[in-house]
Amino acid sequence: MKTDFVQSGGFLTIDTPFGANDLLLDGMEGAEGISELFKFNLFMRSGSSSLSASTIVGKNVTVTMEVEGGSKRYIHGIVSRFIQSGYDVDFATYQAELVPSLWLLTLSRDRKIYQTKSILDIVKAVLGEGSITFSDKTSGTYTALDYCVQYDETDFDFIARLMEHAGIFYYFTFTSSGHTMVLGDAASAHISCAGASTLRFFPRTGQTNPIDTVYRFEFEKRVALKSATVSDYDFIKPATSLSGNNAATTGSGAIYEFGTGSATASESTAKAKIRVDAAQVTSTLLRGDSFAYALNAGTSFTLSDHFISTLNALHVVRRVHHTARDDLYSNSFEAFPAASAFRPPMVTPLPRAMGSETAKVVGPSGEEIWTDQYGRIKVQFPWDRDGKGDDKSSCWIRVSQSLAGVGFGALFLPRIGQEVVVSYLNADPSRPLITGSVYNGTNTTPVKLPDHQTQSTIATWSSKQGTAGNIVRFEDKKDAEQLYFHAQKDLLTEIENALTTTVIAGAEIHTVKKGDRTVDVQTGNETHNVKGTRTLDITGDETHKNGAKFTQNVKGDFELVVDGKLTITVTGAVQIKSSADVLLDAGTSLTSKAAQALTQQAGTALTNKAGTELTNQAGTNLLNKAGVNLTNQASVQLENKGAMIVSKADAMHNVEAGAMLTLKGALTQIN
């Protein structure tokens, strides 16, 4: 095989990790475009049939195109494939595929969370991690996103869809030693094409045309989308419209897009304009063929000498297909008027989270519950390699409840350490929603299963550092049904109207193990109806206080047994009335005392009787009176004593003694 050839002097040359003349570039074919990965197929030969693919695959290679007296055009990239395609007597043939370093991002797939970063910041971060050389020529302002997720998509697809969503395009510029990804969002990002800033329209004559000419140039007009409406929903401002619209002056049709992450109506309007611009740029197409090997996608050139004067203007190259063989070169290209606002088409699909997954509730160290005013929580996904399991691991995520109204509904907040079920609104990984909780090997069920599989339970846990909590438990076991309430501390029941408790059969027991029990009827009555017996067993004192009348009605016997003293104090009158007998029985003495008058009256007979001594005493007068007979009798001695004693009878007064009658005084008068 030949080994004595050199590259110098040819239109095509190549610089590879091999020796300067180990490979000879015979031909090249490939394409580059705005917001597209360029790819060039290289056709080469070598005097060596044993070139090692590992030496060149993944390495930088530069292709140079140059004609005598012309500028150099470089195409730089990395070799993604290297093929030994054949050989003959003199040479071995090889092929290689040249791609940008950005292509390497198509090989990496990940799940990754970005918080409080704008789309442009996220794109730059991914490019930086991938060691991609880029230049930022954007001029727009990009709002920080609360939450953005790369979800089972390549790094390239992730940033591609973000840029398409935001209207950011990219293209590549080249030097002999590298290539640069240029980011843009306006016409100002399109630089003038070096070596082809002005091209002449020069129809092909069959001869080799100059390198500054376009020999075919077509103009095409299409019907494109006219208007777009973009909208979203903000739960913090649910009544606020976030809809925005934009329309072109020409075109037809309308699209409606919901769930774009807009925080304001003006953001939606801006996004609607991006959608319309992306469609409208296709309404005017310019196609051409040329020998201008310097044409570079994303750059601009001015066309001159066209017979349609309106085409002699500034245009931007959207796409170029290059073909070179030995010293021959031509290209075909697409362009659009520089006055058009280019936006990349939305071709990269949004990944869909079809279904649910679980995550762990997280928060700051030392906290057991972490939430905001809307009852949102934060989680750590098991796939998130960057999260630290703290309050920075995710955005605030809303929690689905069984009922949610204006100041009413259900509210159960998942706590730090619990495993929750995460679903996604519209299957968008960047819009998570907590829809439930699940038990696991650490967070076990509140009842032992399957032993108590008939029990349904709501059990909470005291915070902080609690060891138990409140419980509502339903036991549905046949013939052992039970509804159990446990308050870890206080149980407060507040009822706006009536409370009815009915015990069909069985007992009702109230037990206060320690503390007081108070029944406070502030307005209204209290009624107790007991068809059986009622027992009050009080170890200490009992006090009854009535602000008004107190009445007890007893149909049977009423018995009051007092082990100590019985004191009845009445500010008014006291009346004891019995249809039968009244017995006052004192073990020692019985005293009837009145501040003024004491009257004892019997319809038939009144007997005051003492086993030893009976004393009737008055401070002034003592009157014993009977309608018929009055008898004062003593078995031994009856004594009437006073400063003055008067015994008087209207008819007859009989003073009689069975043995002796003694009347004695300092002065005794019998009249």
Language-model features: where?
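Glycine-rich, acidic and aromatic/proline-enriched surface loops and short helix-turn segments
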Residues: 99-101, 116-137, 258-270, 364-392, ...
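Structural signature for extended repeat/solenoid scaffolds and their inter-repeat hinge/linker regions
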Residues: 183-184, 356-633, 637-641, 645-648, ...
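Short alpha-helix capping/helix-loop boundary micro-motifs
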Residues: 41-51, 280-291, 346, 403-409
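Assembly/oligomerization scaffold segments
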Residues: 1-112, 165, 283
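Short, well-ordered loop/turn sites that connect or cap secondary structure elements
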Residues: 55-56, 295, 389, 414
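Acidic, low-complexity/disordered segments
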Residues: 297-299, 308-359, 433-441, 445-456
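Extended, domain-scale alpha-helical bundle/helix-rich regions
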Residues: 71, 87-88, 117-134, 140, ...
